[in-house]
């Protein structure tokens, strides 16, 4: 057997294709998951509403109106307050696996 033919060589094109397929696969999973989740909630919404009329946990909202009242003092976050949290976010990211990072951040894009 020829030693040159049996030698395994590293091909960067395979690595690039693998990353590309991994990203596309993750995006497809997120799109399909979100689609079915919204379809499921649209189908179940009338049933959940009907069931919640007699549900003791839903009645609790009448007992604690302060927990459920609408916040009339809502203001959007100031851009600098969001930017101040960026170092914390960047410190948190390296501790996560690539799959976790992909599943969390891909729906944003």
Swiss-Prot record:
Record's bilayer topology term: Single-pass membrane protein
Protein name as annotated: Putative uncharacterized protein YML099W-A
Any one GO cellular component localisation term in the record: membrane
Listed transmembrane segments: 12-32
Source taxon at top rank: Eukaryota
Keyword terms, alphabetized: Membrane, Transmembrane, Transmembrane helix
Subcellular compartments: Membrane
Main subcellular localisation: membrane
More about this protein: Partially overlaps ARG81.
């Amino acid at each position: 057997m020829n030693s040159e033919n049996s030698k395994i060589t590293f091909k960067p094109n395979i690595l690039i294709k693998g990353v590309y397929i991994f990203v596309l696969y993750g995006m497809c999973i997120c799109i399909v998951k979100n689609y079915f989740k919204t379809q499921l909630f649209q189908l179940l919404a009338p049933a959940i509403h009907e069931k919640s009329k007699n549900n003791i946990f839903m009645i609790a909202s009448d007992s604690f109106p302060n927990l459920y009242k609408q916040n009339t003092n809502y203001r959007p976050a100031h851009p600098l307050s969001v930017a101040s949290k960026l170092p914390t976010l960047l410190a948190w990211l390296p501790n996560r696996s690539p799959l976790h990072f992909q599943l969390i951040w891909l729906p944003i894009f």
